[in-house]
Amino acid sequence: MKIRHFQLATLAAAIAFSGIAAADITVYNGQHKEAAKAVTEAFTKETGIKVTLNSAKSEQLAGQLKEEGDKTPADVFYSEQTAPFAMLSEAGLLEPLSADTIKQTQHKGVPVAPKKDWIALSGRSRVVVYDKNKLSEKDMEKSVLDYATPKWKDKIGYVPTSGAFLEQVIAITKLKGEQVALNWLKGLKENGKLYAKNSVALQAVENGEVPAALINNYYWYALAKEKGEDKLNSRLYFIRHQDPGALVTYSGAAVLKGSKNKEEAKKFVDFLASKKGQEALVAVRAEYPLRTDVVSPFNMEPYAKLEAPEVSATTAQDKENANKLIEQAGLK
């Protein structure tokens, strides 16, 4: 009889243990791999939940998620931009997040998901990087629109395949109108130098191939940390005064409605918004933490001084229209 009781107790303990064992999760990752690796490793260390990262461009992953629908193997979508969330939210593929999770990164200027089904996590600023040996700050324009003019013929680099570039087109369209955005794109094609990546455009400025380029801030800060700011040939210019050239773009995350591991997925997104999660991210990447109690170790321009326009993609149509304009201008 004692043996029987022992067996039942052992079985009950095994069932109880299996019931609390956390499932592993799969993250479709459009964020930079270095940043994603840092936060997932910190999350696993904190919770014991293992994370599989499937990485590609955010827009590509969003398209894949729409095709997969509720049958997706993904639990979380971690995007470098917020624009892809609009399409997925409208398709009903995202799970609402708790108010406690969302409020961790909410403050003035940070985009809010209309259905509370994704969260902004970190920001990066659009900037002009320029060759300090050829240009000075007084040569810089007060609006990003003015870099697409004949004055800058062969003097300005740009990266039309960048997700942040797409969001800048959305910002120009919303703030200045569709025709202005199209004229800007055509002007860049006519007068600018096209590069495949932001890092390549930055290196072109460093090497003296082009005097200036439109990029994201963190590429320059990473290079400055690696080589030393005094060793660089380039400097950053911040356009400010709510111009679309001062745009801050945001990374974010969402739990997929088709996730088979929603509890663990929500824990992961909550961790990304937590102090530990934000600290893990900004330790390796010069992005702005959205928690006010986390400070970046990079010597970045203060977030409060960026004077960014409060504009972002809120519908799938915003993204679709921007892509059409880029294509119409002959840049796709």
Regions flagged by a language model, labelled:
Residues 16-20:
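N-terminal signal peptide c-region/cleavage motif recognized by signal peptidases
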Residues 124, 152-159, 185-188, 192-195, 231-257, 271-294:
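Periplasmic-binding protein-like
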Residues 129-134, 173, 248-261, 280:
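A bilobed periplasmic-binding-protein/Venus flytrap-type ligand-binding module shared by bacterial periplasmic
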Residues 83-87, 211-233:
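A ligand-binding cleft/hinge motif common to bilobed small-molecule-binding domains
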Residues 23-86, 332:
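Early extracytoplasmic/lumenal segment of secretory-pathway proteins
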Residues 178-179, 286-332:
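An extracytoplasmic/periplasmic, membrane-proximal ligand-sensing/linker region
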Residues 30, 34, 73-210, 244:
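Extracytoplasmic ligand-binding site segments that recognize negatively charged/polar headgroups
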